[in-house]
Design a protein with these regions (language model features):
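Bacterial N-terminal signal peptides that target proteins for export
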Residues: 1-9
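Active-/binding-site microenvironments in catalytic and ligand-binding cores
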Residues: 24-348
Length: 348
């Protein structure tokens, strides 16, 4: 028995030492190949894999910028834009306008009698919208799972879900992201404008596309997978028929695990509303205990890896730019669960 205990202890030490060496070799602090991340940052952590961002990693990403060209990865949003059925509609309402100010005359300083003889006015709007529309970054509180409705790091919706937003792992905990980015163009690999409805992007697809592009995913990389869907967004995302035809293509559990556990992807995204293919296969659903969004559960809840959605990758695809510095910041609105209507950038 003593011999067995000593053997187990020795193996544990070797495993931890190997993980430590691997982390040092990759520049990662907590990522372990074959495991990924998970709940490894302590019981109060709300940041997840983005804890890996450092001054050195940001500087390394910026060294990829050689031409100064900026690719705007954001999609324009308005009241008619496409929304997943599980998110609210939106409205943009004019609150003040030059014509209204002249008509109302409710503010003395806006009138000629009040000294405004030059006719100065202003526009001001009220925006009512979901925190999950257009180009977005899912926060770690976005998805819960299990009968206890836990989200990342074991936080419970019953304890941290407030009347005025979430109180743990909200969007303000997402740090500004400056990291190496890689775009994997699966649509180009398949030689189609956009992937077909409910197409599952496999590990083999990702590997073949990376080989074709002569680029690789290294630990700490932000990965963006192109399906071709975003080209149908149009001016404001109102071409819903075209969008919905292709929006259900995406990665499955095997591809998600390969990206995170084998390649060390820091964040994973695409040009669709949900990253993963839907509906999932029974096997993928059961992989997380039964779910209609198994990749979301795996990445956000189990791994603490943020999901990037509806990124406009058409410019990168047209120029065949596959490696770049990815830069994104979220709206600092407390209680929200996703950075929404964003304009991330790829710098080359």
């Amino acid at each position: 028995m003593r011999h067995l205990i000593r053997s187990v202890a020795f193996l544990s030490i070797v495993t931890l030492a190997s993980a430590s060496v691997l982390a040092q070799n990759t520049g990662m602090k907590r990522w372990v190949q074959g495991k990924g991340w998970g709940w490894v940052w302590g019981p109060t952590d709300e940041v997840g894999s983005l804890n890996e961002l450092t001054d050195a990693s940001r500087l390394a990403a910026l060294r990829l910028v050689t031409t100064g060209k900026v690719y705007d990865l954001g999609l324009p949003y308005d009241r008619n834009s496409f929304k997943w059925i599980g998110h609210s509609s939106g409205e943009i309402i004019s609150f003040r306008s030059p014509a209204g100010e002249r008509t109302m005359q409710d503010l003395p300083f806006t009138t000629p009698a009040g000294g405004n003889t030059g006719g100065t006015g202003w526009h001001s709007n009220v925006i009512f919208m979901s925190d999950n529309v257009a180009t977005q970054i899912d926060g770690l509180a976005h998805i819960s799972h299990g009968q206890d409705s836990h989200f990342y790091n074991g936080f419970l919706a019953s304890e941290w879900g407030g009347d005025f937003g979430i109180r743990k792992a909200d969007v303000t905990t997402i740090p500004p992201i400056v990291a190496r980015g890689v775009m994997i163009d699966v649509a180009a690999l398949k030689n189609v404008p956009a992937l077909p409805t409910a197409y599952e992007i496999t590990v083999s697809d990702l590997q073949a596309a990376l080989k074709r592009q002569n680029v690789d995913v290294t630990p700490g990389t932000v990965v963006l997978v192109r399906t071709g869907t975003a080209q149908f967004w149009g001016v404001n995302g109102s071409d819903h028929a075209k969008l919905t035809m292709h929006d259900t293509a995406g990665i499955g559990i095997s591809a998600a695990k390969w990206l995170v556990e084998q390649k060390g992807a820091l964040a994973v995204g695409s040009d669709t509303s949900g990253l993963e293919y839907v509906p999932p296969s029974p096997a993928d659903s059961k992989a997380v205990g039964g779910s209609f969004n198994p990749v979301h559960v795996y990445l956000l809840v189990e791994q603490g890896v943020h999901i990037l959605e509806f990124h406009n990758l058409e410019g990168l695809a047209a120029d065949r730019v596959y490696e770049f510095a990815y830069v994104a910041t979220t709206n600092a609105i407390r209680g929200t669960v996703a950075g929404t209507a964003l304009r991330p950038m790829a710098l080359r």
